[in-house]
């Protein structure tokens, strides 16, 4: 995930604002910095899959809530520090990023040698559960974004991007997966 975010940045392709934290001693400092700019942030291990060890720190939450559909935990800052921070000890480096808003989209892309053959945007019924259903949408902005990703990464074959929008209504790439979701 870290190398993908760095390449997205290099290619000027939108991705969430993020910080890499590679040791526990810096985590509180970086969380405080991100929370000053964003009211809600996401903390996730750079190498996890399927929402494992993903925390959403939100000022809108009192206590914590474990999602029924995923392993995601939404928590206030105090509960994160007192109850959950230690669970990430072996998960460094961590990605701290702005929390994006729902809905989530999958961008299915079929490409050959950096040329798009087919790009299909799908809007998820449930942002946290990609296989819980979707509707195909005709979103020209997402299709253009897919073309740029295919070209810049010189992709060949079938790929899936996870996309959500920021608070300024701009699409942000969360992941590029070499397979359909």
Spans of features found by a protein language model:
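ATP-grasp fold ATP-binding core
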Residues: 8, 34-59, 88-102, 119-122
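Short secondary-structure junction motifs
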Residues: 15, 38, 91, 156-160
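Glycine-rich phosphate-binding loop of ATP-grasp-fold ATP-dependent ligases
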Residues: 15-18, 40-78, 106, 125-135
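Short catalytic-loop micro-motif centered on adjacent basic/acidic residues
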Residues: 16-19, 42, 95-97, 160
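Amphipathic alpha-helical regulatory segments at dimerization interfaces
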Residues: 30-33, 148-152
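Phosphate-binding site of ATP-dependent enzymes
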Residues: 68-132, 136-147, 164-172
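Conserved metal-phosphate-binding beta-hairpin within the catalytic cores
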Residues: 109, 153-181
């Amino acid at each position: 995930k870290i190398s993908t975010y760095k390449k997205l940045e290099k290619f000027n392709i939108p991705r969430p604002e993020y910080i890499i934290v590679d040791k526990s001693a810096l985590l509180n400092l970086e969380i405080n910095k991100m929370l000053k700019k964003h009211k809600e942030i996401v903390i996730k291990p750079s190498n996890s899959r399927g929402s494992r060890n993903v925390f959403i720190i939100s000022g809108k939450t009192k206590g914590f809530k474990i999602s029924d559909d995923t392993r995601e935990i939404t928590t206030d800052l105090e509960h994160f520090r007192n109850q959950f921070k230690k669970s990430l000890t072996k998960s460094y480096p961590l990605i701290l990023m702005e929390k994006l808003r729902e809905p989530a989209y999958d961008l299915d892309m079929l490409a050959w040698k950096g040329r798009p053959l087919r790009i299909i945007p799908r809007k998820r019924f449930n942002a946290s559960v990609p296989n819980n259903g979707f509707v195909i949408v005709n979103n020209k902005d997402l299709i253009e974004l897919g073309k740029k990703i295919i070209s810049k990464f010189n992709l060949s074959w079938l790929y899936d991007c996870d996309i959500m929008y920021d608070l300024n209504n701009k699409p942000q790439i969360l992941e590029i997966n070499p397979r359909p979701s």
